[in-house]
Regions:
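Active-site neighborhoods and metal-handling regions in enzymes and metal-associated proteins
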Residues: 1-281
């Protein structure tokens, strides 16, 4: 139809309230209001957010497929690095690889960080050139069949130092501790605490500077997070990230991120790419 708003107006009961999501553009909402399409308009974002937080079987399959593509892409991304290449040059090649693998492109702007830049969790790729001994952090995600993937792995360009190994192992164990706790009924804040405790016990507590994770689906960051302040219970069908990190200013940073899908009795880890420390180049 040339006027889809008229069709929507015809389908809505003018004697009943109409719930609208917070993201409904004004160019759609205002014409409906002008036509008196409903008795009143109410914000219904909580209901929409709750529905999106609980993935049905088709959505779960889409999340698995997107994450499998992300795993395959990570194996390709690591092959791009060599001495002297810049973060921006690497980042510029990622979307083409995603498209070759069947994805529609990025689910968010990729983070590619070398050396001390990896100590900034939200670093934007720049002209920094890769040098021997640098850590190489990829925080990347693709969009496939409208659903988002998100994963982080941290490598070393050359032989890892003892400190790089220690930090990487601590982050890996924190990731494992959090994943082991994910099941229906577990509280998000307790999952965050499990990862944070591992990092604190290793003496790096002040250097884990962000929440443990976020929910994901049609958008890469959806309402609800895995943090110390979120005491709601985990429920089947929810999908969220587990991404502990240690960030040492002026030195390097390490983050290891996986997506988990909550099942009836535990969780399914959607990423299978190895988490152990590895070298690139």
């Amino acid at each position: 139809t040339d006027d889809p708003l008229s069709l929507v107006a015809e389908l809505v009961d003018t004697q009943e309230p109409l719930g609208c999501d917070k993201n409904l553009p004004a160019r759609f909402l205002l014409p409906l209001m002008e036509r008196g399409a409903a008795a009143r308009f109410v914000l219904a974002s909580d209901a929409v957010d709750d529905a999106r937080a609980h993935k049905d079987e088709a959505e779960r399959a889409a999340m698995r497929a997107a994450s499998a593509t992300n795993d395959a892409a990570m194996g390709r991304f690591r092959e791009l690095v060599h001495e002297g290449i810049t973060e921006a040059e690497v980042a510029g090649q990622l979307e083409g690889i995603y498209r070759e693998l069947g994805a529609q492109g990025h689910s968010f702007a990729p983070i590619v960080s070398f050396g001390a830049n990896a100590a900034d969790p939200h670093h934007e790729p720049d002209g920094t050139r890769l040098a021997p001994g640098d850590v190489v952090l990829f925080d990347v995600g693709c969009r496939q069949n409208e659903y988002c993937a998100d994963m982080t792995r941290t490598f070393v360009f050359g032989k890892p130092t003892p400190k790089q190994r220690e930090v990487h192992d601590t982050v890996r164990r924190a990731n494992e501790a959090a994943r082991a706790l994910v099941r229906p009924g577990a509280r998000f804040c307790d999952i965050d605490r499990a990862a944070r405790q591992v990092i604190e016990d290793a003496g790096y507590g002040p250097y884990f500077t962000h929440r443990l994770g976020h929910q994901i689906g049609l958008d890469v960051h959806e309402p609800g997070d895995v943090s110390a302040t979120h005491d709601a219970p985990v429920e089947p069908g929810m999908c969220f990230s587990i991404e502990p990190g240690i960030y040492l200013p002026g030195e390097f940073g390490v983050r290891i991120e996986d997506l988990v899908l909550v099942t009836e009795d535990g969780c399914e880890v959607l990423n299978s790419y190895p988490r152990e420390i590895d070298t690139v180049g």
